[in-house]
């Protein structure tokens, strides 16, 4: 790595921030150098979001200082941060949908023609120049409504460049992106670094951190643990720094001899979505559905569970066919579905933790048609305790929990039904590494107890670390089946993309 310049573009120096009696950040320091991508990592609650809000001008530090180009500055508002060349790109951008791309980029700074009118021609020309600089084609006259998350993020980056930002903070930007969209974003980030900007990258995905970044800062419990070059570090090194202990294994897979066939899917088809899907899952087996976004993985299992329709095919649990289009029939047969979007599909965010954890057993817990709080609370306590769910009060709204603890509540809800088939769709998306290991442990333990598990995952390390078999889907069809010993990243990606025949 080349030697960075002596003066960083931005430096966080010994900052502290508390909210009431809770210290969110304590004595954190790190530099951001021009020409580098710098990862900021830590478990949920480590203080990363507070640091981002400091840099964005939302919160000021209680003590310590922020320096831009070696000069101490006060970022009392987002406009102060913008004036100092700092821009934050969030996971879910907030563009104005009824304005054009160019209007979103230059809102508040539109070029003016004579008589003070907005010069739309000049604005569109300037927007095109920004996208040319980023190396991405985009029509500046298009409305922002309907843009993908990936394209919205590029508009936000173009907006940052339009204000001469040279410190770009990317806060979990890849969580909702496909593989191709991630690579395009990385290409843009690398071009920003090549032009002398500093990029701060926040992500739970280690493969992305190692692919993009040159330096990493680790936080734990609001404190600075280390800042170092990534070269020579391993994922295990980062995990140990982040969680303060050796996780033993991020993928604590328990080897189990599979039992009898529990789930059978035969010739399942839905026009335009998936076709002729057939596979079996045995007791104690974890079968992963892998493939690119849009391959039809989630749709197949939602159809099998009865949430989505199917045109033809059969779904059997322990040899008994299920009535199609009936989640109730699937549940009675012993199936459970942990959906991809836990906030929209798996939880009722305004409802309490205890009520969410017992939703699947409301009828069983009721007496004479009424649900009494004591029985509900005991059941919720039992399952949230088993899953080591962290919360202040079990009566709190589930929406206040971290992503990892929300996922545990969804799992608790289904584990309380004693399922024989568990479908988990992107089970660790958006949760920190320590909680990922806990979720993996839960899934592995369930399999060891005889549950047949179908895991849909876009994270290849998770697929390879947890699955006994891997079924690869492409364009709505299963194109490859790989045993645990056969599967590797190359074979899965070749099959998923159709670029080469997989074994």
From Swiss-Prot:
Domain ABC transporter: 10-246, 256-500
Main localization (coarse): membrane
SMART domains from the UniProt entry: AAA
GO MF annotation list: ABC-type D-ribose transporter activity; ATP binding; ATP hydrolysis activity
InterPro entries reported in the protein's UniProt record: AAA+_ATPase, ABC_carbohydrate_import_ATPase, ABC_transporter-like_ATP-bd, ABC_transporter-like_CS, P-loop_NTPase
CDD domains assigned: ABC_Carb_Monos_I, ABC_Carb_Monos_II
Signal peptide: none
Gene Ontology annotations for the cellular component aspect, listed alphabetically: plasma membrane
Enzyme class: translocase
Catalytic reaction equation(s): D-ribose(out) + ATP + H2O = D-ribose(in) + ADP + phosphate + H(+)
Pfam families: ABC_tran (PF00005)
Family matches, as Gene3D superfamilies: P-loop containing nucleotide triphosphate hydrolases
Residues binding ATP: 42-49
Subcellular localization: Cell membrane
SUPFAM superfamilies reported for this sequence: P-loop containing nucleoside triphosphate hydrolases
EC number, as in UniProt: 7.5.2.7
Keywords on record: ATP-binding, Cell membrane, Membrane, Nucleotide-binding, Repeat, Sugar transport, Translocase, Transport
Membrane topology listed for this record: Peripheral membrane protein
Function text: Part of the ABC transporter complex RbsABC involved in ribose import. Responsible for energy coupling to the transport system.
Protein family (similarity comment): Belongs to the ABC transporter superfamily. Ribose importer (TC 3.A.1.2.1) family.
Self-association state and partner proteins as the record states: The complex is composed of an ATP-binding protein (RbsA), two transmembrane proteins (RbsC) and a solute-binding protein (RbsB).
Name assigned to this protein: Ribose import ATP-binding protein RbsA
Organism of origin: Rhodococcus jostii (strain RHA1)
């Amino acid at each position: 790595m080349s030697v960075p310049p002596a003066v960083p573009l931005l430096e966080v120096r010994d900052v502290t921030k508390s909210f009431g009696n809770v210290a969110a950040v304590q004595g954190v320091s790190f530099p951001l150098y021009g020409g580098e991508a710098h990862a900021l990592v830590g478990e949920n609650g480590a203080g990363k979001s507070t640091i981002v809000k400091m840099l964005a001008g939302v919160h000021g530090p209680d003590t310590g200082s922020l320096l831009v180009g070696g000069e101490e500055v006060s970022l009392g508002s987002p406009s102060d941060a913008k004036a100092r060349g700092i821009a934050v790109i969030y996971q879910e951008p907030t563009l104005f949908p009824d304005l054009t791309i160019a209007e979103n980029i230059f809102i508040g700074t539109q070029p003016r023609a004579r008589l003070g009118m907005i010069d739309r021609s000049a604005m569109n020309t300037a927007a095109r120049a920004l996208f040319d600089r980023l190396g991405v084609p985009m029509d500046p006259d298009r409305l922002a409504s309907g843009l993908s998350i990936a394209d919205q993020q590029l508009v936000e980056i173009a907006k940052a460049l339009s204000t001469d930002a040279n410190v770009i903070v990317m806060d979990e930007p890849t969580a909702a992106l496909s593989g191709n969209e991630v690579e395009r974003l990385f290409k843009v980030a690398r071009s920003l670094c090549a032009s002398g900007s500093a990029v701060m990258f926040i992500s739970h995905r280690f493969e992305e951190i190692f692919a993009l970044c040159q330096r990493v800062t680790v936080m734990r419990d609001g404190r600075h643990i280390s800042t170092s070059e990534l070269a020579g570090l391993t994922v295990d090194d980062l995990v140990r720094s982040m969680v303060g202990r050796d996780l033993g294994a991020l993928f604590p897979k328990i080897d189990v001899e599979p039992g009898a066939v529990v789930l059978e899917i035969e010739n399942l088809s839905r026009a335009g979505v998936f076709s002729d899907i057939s596979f079996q899952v045995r007791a104690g087996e974890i079968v992963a559905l892998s493939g690119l976004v849009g391959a039809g993985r989630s749709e197949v299992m939602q159809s099998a569970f009865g949430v989505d329709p199917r045109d033809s095919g059969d779904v059997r649990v322990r040899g008994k066919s299920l009535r199609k289009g009936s989640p109730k029939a699937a549940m009675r047969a012993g199936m459970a579905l942990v959906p991809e979007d836990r906030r929209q599909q798996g939880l009722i965010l305004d409802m309490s933790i205890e009520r969410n954890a017992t939703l699947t057993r409301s009828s069983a817990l009721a007496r004479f048609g009424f649900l009494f709080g004591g029985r509900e609370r005991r059941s919720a306590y039992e399952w949230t305790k088993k899953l080591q769910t962290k919360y202040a009060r079990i009566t709190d709204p589930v929406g206040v929990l971290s992503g990892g603890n929300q996922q545990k509540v969804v799992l608790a809800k289904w584990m309380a039904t004693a399922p024989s088939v568990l479908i988990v769709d992107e089970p660790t998306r958006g949760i920190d590494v320590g909680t990922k290991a806990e979720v993996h442990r839960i899934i592995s333990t369930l399999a060891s107890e005889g549950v047949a598990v179908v895991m849909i995952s876009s994270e290849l390390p998770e697929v390879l670390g947890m699955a006994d078999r891997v079924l690869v889907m492409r364009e709505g069809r299963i194109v490859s089946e790989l045993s645990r010993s056969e599967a590797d990243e190359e074979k899965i990606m070749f099959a998923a993309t159709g670029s080469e025949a997989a074994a």
